[in-house]
């Protein structure tokens, strides 16, 4: 309470503005924003649970929404259709179509991730380095050598290329590097 009746109490936004502390002004303005990840999960939740959600003020990413829904088989027809024709639609129309087409349900789970076999990556990188070709050609070389039964002979010749620096290019995991080095010595 002020001693004088003429004193006006300023809120944090006004204090920041009058003091021309622009970082404080920005942080005060940011306090009204929702985090992008919360908005994303709110949008996905609205599609899954068929609840109303206004996306006019939200950061709507068609790609991320389609990617999230494509992790579940029952959503694939709707996601496939949007992948083909949805790029020309507005965000609101895209959202409305998915609201209508995706079946209602709880969808929780980890997203699918690519898991590469470090041994395969080592062999492909060795072949690419030896024959000075790109990764796709090295994969073709590997299949041809395997078919002809010559892959073990070639790997025996190439084990000298397996150095610590080369293994760092293959994987950053130190434990895997040691295992790959041990494997290469056994060739």
Curated annotation (Swiss-Prot):
One of its GO terms (molecular function) is DNA binding. GO terms for biological process: bidirectional double-stranded viral DNA replication; DNA replication. InterPro entries: Phage_clamp_gp62 (IPR031868). Keywords: DNA replication, DNA-binding, Viral DNA replication. Gene3D superfamilies: 6.10.250.1260, Bacteriophage clamp loader A subunit, A domain, Bacteriophage clamp loader A subunit, A' domain. Pfam families: Phage_clamp_A (PF16790). It comes from the Viruses. Forms the sliding-clamp-loader together with the small subunit. The clamp loader holds the clamp in an open conformation and places it onto the DNA. The sliding-clamp-loader consists of 4 large subunits and 1 small subunit. Interacts with the sliding clamp; this interaction allows the sliding-clamp-loader to open the sliding clamp. Part of the replicase complex that includes the DNA polymerase, the polymerase clamp, the clamp loader complex, the single-stranded DNA binding protein, the primase, the helicase and the helicase assembly factor. Belongs to the Tevenvirinae sliding-clamp-loader small subunit family. This is Sliding-clamp-loader small subunit. It comes from Enterobacteria phage T4 (Bacteriophage T4).
